[in-house]
Amino acid sequence: LISVLMLTACSEDKISGDGVDLTNEFEITDDPNDPVQHERYQIFKEYNVPVLFNDTIAKRQIGTDLYGKPVMQYETVDLNWDFDSYSNSVQYVYDYLKTDESKMDALRFVRKFLEMCSKRMRPFSIMVANNLTSKPESSSLAEKQYISGFRTLVFYNVSNLSDDDIKTTARDVIYDMVAQKVKANKDLCTMFEAVSSKYYFRSWEELGGCTTCLEWCKKSTYISTNNLYYGLPYNAVEGSTAAYKFDFVDLVTSRKMVADKEEAKEVLSTIVQEIGNYGFIRGNKNTGSYSPADAEEDRNYFVQAILTLGDEKFNERYGRCALVMEKYELLKDFMVNELGLEL
């Protein structure tokens, strides 16, 4: 949300991040002679999302004080606002982008993000900083490259990325945003959890019916229910050089354990079916020999798989697993109808 501050000032200081029309604080005006401002304008025109480089949206004179000095009103981005509450327990500290080159690099990232994002998922506004810290310190800020406020999505550490990293980072942000929106829908989460509620954090051996899974987990460094998650047709980054491996190798000797690609695919298909009978598409993040620890871990795997594979490939891979597809349909309905995603 926007914080409003009223201060007395003797002179009008220029606000960094020019081009914000004060008659409409979020409207970006064009300046063909300024590459940064022109690109901000182009993004605003194409996606209707203003991009800011600092937390000051606008300032204007709203009157004078008793001494005839101007009283200024400042409107700033305030990440402490939530949908229905406000807390000032956290102080956010921005390190702004200082050069036109870094700003143009950041705008390249913003453009790719908006291109990949569904219209309903686009934020009201975007702010890009060089870095963002908080007092008290937050581990989640250090781990991520964005924070979502009530009306503003703030990106940081995105101004020096390669083209591949831009795509990967934008994708990961979208994955996380979708996962958070799913998490916020309590009814959806309850229905999702109910499908496999009896099977969380149990070994495949205890659950039973996973003989192929258990066999290959014991004798191969590659085959586990976690690595399986990235097998065909799953490919986390399209065109990635980290190609899918068909070389199932022995734990000790590294000897190949399958004759050819087709046998490898058959083994994978069998394991997909075995753990899919319990509604799972991969194992626990800490040990592939167990099912996911809880519904949240499980949901996040589904969100990533759905967004990566899309409807056709998800059905191709998991269509014969009834419980997996039951969860899929729950999430698909929400993603398509509420978030406007195209799967």
For each predicted feature, which ranges?
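Acidic/polar, low-complexity intrinsically disordered N-terminal segments immediately downstream
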Residues: C10-R108, R317-L343
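Active-site recognition of the HExxH zinc-binding catalytic motif
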Residues: T152-G208
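A cross-kingdom marker for long, charged
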Residues: T241-A243, V249-L343
